[in-house]
């Protein structure tokens, strides 16, 4: 698929894709994923062609931007590494997020509270989100999926080839997808200017890591308070010594 020059992959985005290990695929390859295979390393790991990845990101973004009501797009991730990314994507684009377990019947059983009638479904992993893809096929909802080289492509209309198991890779794909959607909608007018949102915001964060960071910040804050108190005490001591010296001079006069 040839893209207009405006949509070409920039060196900066290519570096992001490589740094996030988007190009690292699985050791097995499904027959439908062979067009996205770049080469195989000596250790058996297959490399994904990031140029094909970028083409599919642009195609998916154009499909998403063509839907008038953003809430009719449902972003799904039962995989832990993709839940934060899905929530951020929905916050920035206005889509509906399903982060966590997908409730069976959400697309087919109108009696359930979680019933939805989306016009487009985006999933993080065709294996872990198989229930959502299956129900979407029952009601003719097109599906966009982040797929590895060994991922099944049944009922998937647009496959974005990438490493859909790494937390950085998943977060970056959702980030680039959201950025391209906003550009196509006109929210980000100048393509030469970087988006103010950083890709790190889409990356999964371990709760223990967050608690540890908060504890370190609290400890650092306590140390700063203690240091300020020590400085204030020293200043008070110096002021008292100076005042005492002045009083002695006055007394000697």
Swiss-Prot record:
Signal peptide: none annotated. It comes from the Eukaryota. Keywords: Acetylation, Cytoplasm, Ribonucleoprotein, Ribosomal protein. It holds the Pfam family Ribosomal_S2. The modification N-acetylserine is found at residue 2. Residues 212-253 are annotated as: Disordered. One of its GO terms (molecular function) is structural constituent of ribosome. Belongs to the universal ribosomal protein uS2 family. PANTHER family: 40S RIBOSOMAL PROTEIN SA (PTHR11489). This is Small ribosomal subunit protein uS2. It comes from Eremothecium gossypii (strain ATCC 10895 / CBS 109.51 / FGSC 9923 / NRRL Y-1056) (Yeast). The gene is RPS0.
């Amino acid at each position: 698929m040839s893209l207009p020059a405006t949509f070409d992959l920039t060196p900066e985005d290519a570096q992001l894709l490589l740094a996030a290990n988007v190009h690292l695929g699985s050791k097995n390859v499904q027959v439908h994923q062979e067009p996205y295979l770049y080469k195989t390393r000596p250790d058996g790991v297959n490399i994904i062609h990031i140029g094909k990845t970028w083409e599919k990101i642009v195609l998916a973004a154009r499909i998403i931007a063509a839907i008038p009501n953003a809430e009719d797009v449902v972003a799904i991730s039962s995989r832990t590494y993709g839940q934060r990314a899905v929530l951020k994507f929905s916050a920035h684009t206005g889509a509906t997020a399903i982060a966590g377990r997908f409730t069976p019947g959400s697309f087919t059983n109108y009696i359930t509270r979680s019933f939805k009638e989306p016009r487009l479904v985006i999933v993080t992993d065709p294996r872990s989100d198989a229930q959502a893809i299956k129900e979407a096929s029952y009601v003719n909802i097109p599906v966009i999926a982040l797929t590895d080289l060994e991922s099944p492509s049944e009922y998937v209309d647009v496959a974005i080839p990438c490493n859909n198991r790494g937390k950085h890779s998943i977060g970056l794909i959702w980030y680039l997808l959201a950025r391209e959607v906003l550009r196509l909608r006109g929210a980000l007018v100048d393509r030469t200017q970087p988006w103010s949102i950083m890709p790190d915001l889409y990356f999964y964060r371990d709760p223990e890591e967050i608690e540890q960071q908060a504890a370190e910040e609290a400890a650092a804050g306590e140390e700063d308070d203690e240091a300020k108190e020590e400085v204030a005490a020293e200043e008070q001591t110096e002021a008292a010594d100076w005042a005492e010296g002045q009083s002695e001079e006055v007394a000697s006069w």
